[in-house]
Amino acid sequence: MSGNTFGKLFAVTNFGESHGPAIGCVIDGCPPGMTLSVTDIQPDLDRRRPGTSKFVTQRNEPDAVEILSGVYEGKTTGTPICLLIKNTDQRSKDYGNIVQTFRPGHADYTYYQKYGIRDPRGGGRSSARLTAPMVAAGAVAKKWLFEHYGTVFRGCMTQIGELPITFESWDFVPDNPFFAPIADVSALASYMEVLRKAGDSCGARIRVSASNVPVGLGEPLFDKLDADIAYAMMGINAVKGVEIGAGFASVAQHGSSHGDSLSPKGFKSNNAGGVLGGISSGQDLELSIAIKPTSSILTPRESIDMAGQSTEVITKGRHDPCVGIRATPIAEAMLALVVMDHALRQRAQCGDVTVNLKPIKASI
């Protein structure tokens, strides 16, 4: 199938192109009776929105969301919710020089080989602009999960290019354009300014977490919670790696330290990242994603044209020197969509299950 729908019971179908009239999504499976308006969705879109600082693309899109269906008198009806975001600041002429060439690192070549046709305007369907509808859908999921379980999603940047970022406090994340958990981002700004002047780009590492996640979410064997989390994160543009819990550091750990000990007072560690056997443990979901450097750069690079001949490509237009800067709200949204889908699946299959053992605390 065509791969434009994410989720099973909370299913989100994404539509649109970067330079088309609009982008959006249809959410099928949202429970009825939840209060919902654009004010519940717009704040997350504003966090992802382009043109908010000199360190991101200067494409100035308001990303104003419209609710076209699925809400009546301020409440969800249980029918499909259509969310629409109009494109207002396209500059398709910026892509005239690449109509007959393939940009290195982009989906131009593979889209053409697969479909026999491609939309060169801003990458068309492969553009990161299509993450905006997922952020909108994620806001709906976040609201339902918070109201039912108190679940809270957070994210921050922990590395940009070669610069590691030491975590100080979540409180600093909303106050700077990097979503960095530090008070002073001057070193990050200087680093990005050097890259911008050089016409180059860099990657980033993003941490995402969810707290107050109910125990029991996940469907072994093949729809494990962590499997679906990894699947969701890899669906984000430019993501090339996912770690859950201790991740690749687990290789150097011993079983005596990696296994998260349980006590009557709670878990003593969280190397598993909140998932055991593919099922949520009630601990915080903890993960990190690796984002590659932006492929659209001013540095000349070797490629081929539509005839297979050698050519040189210089990408013009307005692009993020580090796509990881705006990835935090996107990753939060995708995690929320996974948790939401599994919460509904758990309620459907195991809603009547009771056990005598009360869940222990997520941490001591």
Swiss-Prot record:
Disulfide bonds: none
Pathway: Metabolic intermediate biosynthesis; chorismate biosynthesis; chorismate from D-erythrose 4-phosphate and phosphoenolpyruvate: step 7/7
Matches recorded under SUPFAM superfamilies: Chorismate synthase, AroC
Keywords, in A-Z order: Amino-acid biosynthesis, Aromatic amino acid biosynthesis, FAD, Flavoprotein, FMN, Lyase, NADP
Protein origin, superkingdom: Bacteria
Single GO biological process annotation from the record: aromatic amino acid family biosynthetic process
Enzyme class, spelled out: lyase
Cofactor note: Reduced FMN (FMNH(2)).
Keyword Amino-acid biosynthesis: yes
Cross-referenced Gene3D superfamilies: Chorismate synthase AroC
Binding-site list for FMN: 125-127, 237-238, 277, 292-296, 318
Record carries keyword Amino-acid biosynthesis: yes
EC number: 4.2.3.5
Cofactor(s) needed: FMNH2
Alphabetized GO MF terms: chorismate synthase activity; FMN binding
Assembly: Homotetramer.
Function: This reaction introduces a second double bond into the aromatic ring system.
Family: Belongs to the chorismate synthase family.
Name under which the protein is recorded: Chorismate synthase
Gene name of the record: aroC
